[in-house]
Amino acid sequence: MRADNKTIIIGRVLLFLLCLAPLQLLLWDAVQQQLGANPVEALLHRSGEWALRLLLATLAVTPLRRVTGWGWLLRFRRMLGLYAFFYALFHFVVYLWLDRGLSWGEIGVDLLQRPYISIGFAALLILLALAATSTKGVMRRLGRRWTALHQWVYAAGLFSVIHYLWLVKSDYREPGLYAAIFLLLMLFRMGQVKRRLQHRFRVYFNAPQNMTFPESRSRISE
C-alpha cells in the first residue's frame, strides 16, 4: 500500500493532534481540579505513561513496516519520537518543579539514592540527544555516526520500562504489559518472529512476496 504526499500531510496533521490530545486532557483536568487527591502524582504518572507509550509506538514503526510492507509508516516515526521526548521532558519538569520544588539538594539525593530516578534520567538524556540530532541537516553532518547514535533509542526504551517497573510497588500489570511489548519488539528486531508474521500478512492480503521498501536509518526521525 502506497500513500501520496497529500495523504501523508493529512496523516501528519492528524497524528500531531492525536499526540497532543493527552496533554490537553491533562491540563484540562488540572484546571478543573480533577486530578484526584494528589495532583502532582497524577501529573507525573500520566505524563510518564504517555512518554513510554509513544516511545514504544516509535519502536514499533519498523516492525510494522516490515510486516505490512507499508513504507509510508516511516514518515510518521520522527513525530512519534519527538512527542515521546516532549512527554518525557514534561514528566521531568513536573518532578523538578512541582514534586521537588527545584530543591537541587533533594534532586541530587534522589539521583544518587533512588535507582529508578537515575535510570529514568538516563533515558531522558538519551531522548534529548536523539531529539537534538533528529534533523536532516545533522544527519548529513554526522553520517554513519548519526546512525549509531540513534540506535540508542532501544536503550532509552529499556531504561524507561525498567524505570516504570522499579517505581511500582504492588500492581505490576500495567508496567508488565509495557515490558512485554518492549520484549516483543526486541524479539522482532532479532528476527525471531519477523518472517512468520510477514508471510501471514502477505498471504492474507495477497501481497507480492518480493515487495520491499527502502529502510530508513533512524528510530526517532525520518
Place the predicted regions along the sequence by residue.
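Membrane-embedded alpha-helical bundles that constitute the cytochrome b-like, heme-associated redox core
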Residues: 1-222
